[in-house]
Amino acid sequence: MKQLIVGVGLLLAGSPAFASHLAAGPLASGKINGGPAQNHIACYIFNNGTKAVKLSAKSIAGNDGSNVLNDDRCGSKLNSGVGCVLFASSVSASQPYDCAVTASPSTDVRGSIESRSAAGAVLANQALR
């Protein structure tokens, strides 16, 4: 029985669907805080690969975990060589926020989160990992 399970596992591991599942993953930042001048949060996503990727589970969250994302300019698919942005415009000053998105496949997807002032100045930033 053990040999059958191992055999099926190896068979699945070689399948494109399984490989795609393994390559899917969340990209997330740690919390950033722009201080008292913080007005909005921008989360940038860029597909540096040669094929389109699927995007899901997008969020910009505060300390309480609630998703404050209110402007999704990414959609569900990001073509190769293209970037997009997620915004949260109703954020509290001095509260930390993070950004997360699941990309499939995620190997060539990069991103960053920025805390900005009302004038658009970057107050804090961090890469998504």
How would you label these PLM feature ranges?
Residues 18-129:
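Gly/Pro-rich, tryptophan- and cysteine-flecked surface segments typical
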Residues 10-18:
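Hydrophobic h-region of N-terminal signal peptides that target proteins for export
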Residues 1-4:
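Positively charged n-region of N-terminal signal peptides that target proteins for export
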